[in-house]
């Protein structure tokens, strides 16, 4: 076997292309959204999130891609032996894609983020209504980072002004830094064991 450091963004792109998938024997996506939230929280804090194990097996017939969309590769070149739930979570959130749950139904994972406090929460009505939250961080990942950040800051300024309050320069810097940190999770490096 060999070990390779790969960035989350590289792995997510391999999944999107269909180059990286699951062997047929793997279970469907079973993590509750709270575990996905905790995964993103650990990453933004710089905590390790484990390793991945991939198997290069071009001859394996019974393997499947992740997600519910069509892919460039008809069958994956590599399959995930260990780390399926983490990679599926990252792919679904960073690409805004639905996954199949244990009942084989399409499922959207909604994770909210508060850039002022740098905290994540499972998306629910409060985070949807409260404009200090990015309701679904998938929207940030599939948008242009600069324009997304500026739109968020402008909306937050308007919210504050409607309450007779001001968004300070210090708060703007905190928001900008934390949204940048959110985007930079795509550069988070994982150790990948290839067998």
Q: What are these model-predicted stretches?
A:
Residues 1-195:
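Basic- and aromatic-enriched surface patches that contact anionic nucleotides/nucleic acids
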């Amino acid at each position: 076997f060999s070990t390779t450091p790969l960035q989350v963004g590289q792995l997510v792109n391999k999944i999107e292309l269909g180059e990286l998938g699951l062997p047929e024997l793997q279970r469907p996506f079973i993590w509750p959204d709270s575990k996905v939230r905790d995964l993103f929280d650990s990453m933004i804090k710089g905590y390790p999130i484990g390793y991945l194990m991939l198997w290069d097996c071009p001859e394996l017939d019974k393997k499947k891609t992740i997600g519910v969309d069509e892919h460039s590769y008809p069958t994956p070149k590599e399959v995930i032996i260990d780390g399926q739930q983490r990679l599926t979570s990252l792919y679904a959130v960073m690409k805004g894609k639905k996954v199949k749950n244990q009942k084989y139904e399409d499922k959207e994972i909604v994770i909210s983020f508060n850039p002022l406090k740098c905290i994540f929460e499972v998306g629910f009505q409060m985070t949807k209504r409260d404009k200090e939250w990015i309701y679904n961080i998938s929207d940030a990942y599939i948008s242009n980072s600069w324009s997304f950040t500026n739109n968020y800051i402008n909306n937050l300024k308007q919210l504050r002004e409607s309450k007779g309050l001001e968004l300070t320069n210090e708060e703007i810097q905190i928001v900008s830094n934390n949204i940048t940190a959110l985007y930079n999770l795509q550069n988070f490096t994982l150790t990948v064991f290839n067998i």
